[in-house]
A protein has these predicted regions:
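A generic tandem-repeat structural signature
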Residues: 56-124
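Solenoidal tandem-repeat scaffolds enriched in leucines and small polar residues
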Residues: 103-166, 174
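A surface-exposed partner-binding patch
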Residues: 212-295
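Ankyrin-repeat boundary/"N-cap" motif
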Residues: 8-18, 41-55, 76-85, 108-116, ...
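Ankyrin repeat domain, specifically the short helix-to-loop turn at the C-terminus of the second helix
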Residues: 29-38, 66-74, 96-104, 129-137, ...
Length: 295
């Protein structure tokens, strides 16, 4: 069996793959002399094909990397840019080499992953500073990776981003977080009070809401974590928890008096015996969140 790191384990692979991952330059020269296209993906398994440079970078085979680049391998492939592979699998020597030969440090792959995210996926935390120093700065590009890193609870990594000026309130939508949460909202959704306090201590804003109006406090209420909810309540403006202010906020919705009374009561749920849903539970009046459905 041949293990190509996280690309998979294979019973057998084409000889050219062995030549690439073992740095057999004479074998590569022989293939080139017979018309081999060094940018054409190689079928490694039934559902797995990878370019020669990708294989060399994944396996960190420097002789093959250098030979392929010298013979015209594409460094800025749209699906798998060499810089992302280098920071995910390689070391400083490999990273510097591909950059010196034209690799784009701002490249994104086919699923819009950038260099910081790639390094985190590969757990190559030592490459984060290298990426920043090469001009793909934390201040401009680090927000997405920082938010994704919240759930890993690696405080050393989070310290790196914060110390280098990351936007701690980054909340742009993406495929993972289309509802525009801040890192603090993500931590609240994972019911991680320690992380929430850490983020607040470093300047996270407790009042920024998600796309549907949920903020850290209301997320804590929804999750049923009253300790976290009380923590956020002490940090929020007093008017957020004032009944008259809430009624003014809800006035445009023209709520029936019966509904207002229900939301002020102690029983905030009702059962649905003939439905796929067991019951519906509501937030208290002061914690309701106005939002628009659809457009």
């Amino acid at each position: 069996m041949i293990q190509l790191k996280d690309l998979g384990k294979f019973e057998s692979v084409p000889k050219i793959v062995i030549d690439i991952i073992e740095g057999n330059i004479s074998g590569l020269e022989l293939e080139l002399s017979t018309g081999w296209d060094i940018n054409k993906p190689i079928e490694v398994g039934e559902y797995s094909d990878h370019s020669p440079l990708e294989l060399a970078l994944v396996m960190c085979c420097i002789p093959s990397i250098q030979w392929l680049v010298e013979h015209g391998a594409v460094l800025n492939d749209e699906e798998n840019p060499s810089f992302l592979l280098a920071v995910r699998y390689g070391n400083k020597e490999i990273i510097d080499y591909v950059v010196d030969h034209g690799a784009n440090v701002h490249a994104l792959n086919r699923v819009k992953v950038d260099a910081f995210q790639a390094a985190l996926y590969g757990k190559k935390y030592e490459n984060l500073q290298i990426i920043h120093d090469l001009g793909h700065s934390v201040q401009k590009y680090g927000g997405k990776a920082f938010r994704n890193a919240i759930t890993d609870r690696n405080y050393e990594v989070l310290d790196f981003f914060i110390n280098n000026g990351v936007d701690i309130n980054y909340n742009k939508p993406d495929s993972v977080y289309p509802f525009k949460p801040t890192p603090l909202c993500v931590a609240a959704r994972y019911v991680d009070l320690k992380m929430c306090k850490y983020l607040v201590e470093h300047g996270a804003d407790v009042t920024i809401t998600e796309k549907d109006g949920m903020r850290p406090y209301s997320i804590a209420i929804e999750r049923g974590d009253m300790e976290m909810a009380e923590y956020f309540k002490t940090l929020e403006p007093v008017e957020y928890h004032d009944k008259q202010n809430k009624m003014d906020q809800l006035k445009p919705f023209k709520l029936p008096k019966a509904l207002v009374s229900f939301l002020e009561g102690d029983t905030l749920y009702f059962e649905l015996p003939d439905s796929d849903f067991i019951s519906i539970e509501f937030l208290p009046l002061l914690d309701t969140v106005p939002f628009k459905v659809g457009r």
